[in-house]
Amino acid sequence: MRYFALTDLTKPTAKFTTDAMELRQISNAYLNQAQAYLQKGLKQLKKDYKNAILYTPKTEYKRFLKWKQTFLQDLNQTQKRFFIVRAQHFSYVLLFNLLDEQVEAVIATFNNFLDEHRLEAQSKQFDLDTAVNELHDYFDQLQKNTAYSEDLPTHLTQKTEQLINARNTQLTNLLNKIATTKPPLNKQQRLLASFRNYHEHLFLKNEVKKVTWLNEPRAKKESVTPDEEHIIELKNVYKYITNGVTTNAVLKGIDLKLKAHDFIVILGPSGSGKTTLLNIISGMDRPSSGSVVVNGQEMICMNDRQLTNFRRNYVGYIFQQYGLLPNLTVRENVEVGANLQRNPDKRINIDELLEAVGMKHLQKKLPNELSGGQQQRVSIARAFAKNPLLIFGDEPTGALDLEMTQIVLKQFLAIKQRYKTTMVIVTHNNLIAQLADLVIYVADGKIQALQANPNPKQVEDINWI
């Protein structure tokens, strides 16, 4: 039996809708599709592993059904969470972030179940001592990744210790029972597997509670003294994520200071945490623990509304997936960015921007009439038009050809020089790093190296071939 995957489900190609009824229809259709897929998978698991315990997969599936029913019943009241007021439309991106999170939680339990029982089905002879050592190693690894912060409520940290102590005691009792009763090897194997599943569930359930708490805004801390030299400062920053079943540390103990007016590049392999780092310093997300101070403001204390206001006042963001409003023309999309700048004198001339990115002759076109590279150019112009204090970009030149990449990068550097803007971008292109005042190398959620460049190159000085 093959593994389950979210990609087996079909999603709409559209990204936005202005019709609340359409939002409900899309939600209902997708959740029904997911339910049928998961129900079929659960039946197949029962058929293939009828003698195995299906407690966790079945329980998680039932939780999903209950959540689905509640979600659809309450959608008329809760649909505002998917509504972008500024653009007057519902976002399918926001909708499917929520729906997929629920479906993935069930899929994770199905796949974990498959992993466990495929291992059990291996032909090698079961050895109790080896299995117990593997069990200890597994739980040791779980404990190393436990979420922690000094801010955590005492009852959650104490619960972790209680679970560890109870598990050790119960394992000793189980091994004594096996030594006394000497059951067959296959029963010993089942007893240990059941023990692992049960205690893993308890441990991760508490971890999910901890991470959920950590990802909420903190109580307001003491006022931060602005650092005139460094516009961004991170101290011991962690970011944990959860799908409702398991947890993962994406950033691990990040310490970082970024100077104002610098051009900064973040490099790292896929899954290294570089986009998460960008999201946290740009106010797109909060850290789970530690301190993130941007322009003198402590980000971990901000609620969602305050983060939105922070981005509106100080940040321009160039999204990897463009993020253009589909019912607005090229020019109108750029004007949206410009209008976020409350001081009209600070706005950058839209005609000059469109000319610079080669889109002035297409300014009356809608996004669906443009290529991917053209949409990215509009996204870049929109971020620049506001003339924000900080500009962040997630692969901002990823969809551009070589010639336009160079044109856009020249525009980046010109705006930085003229307006003293601080710019931070994530990229896979090592050549772009030669333009940076500072290069941050990220791997496995940690900063592996910082490379300051006292004499950054100009675009025309780089061999782009």
Swiss-Prot record:
Keyword Chaperone: no
Keywords attached to this entry: ATP-binding, Nucleotide-binding, Transport
SUPFAM superfamilies: P-loop containing nucleoside triphosphate hydrolases
Any matching Pfam family: ABC_tran
Residues the record lists as binding ATP: 268-275
Keyword Nucleotide-binding included in the entry's annotation: yes
Family: Belongs to the ABC transporter superfamily.
Protein's recorded name: Putative ABC transporter ATP-binding protein MG065 homolog
Species for this entry: Mycoplasma pneumoniae (strain ATCC 29342 / M129 / Subtype 1)
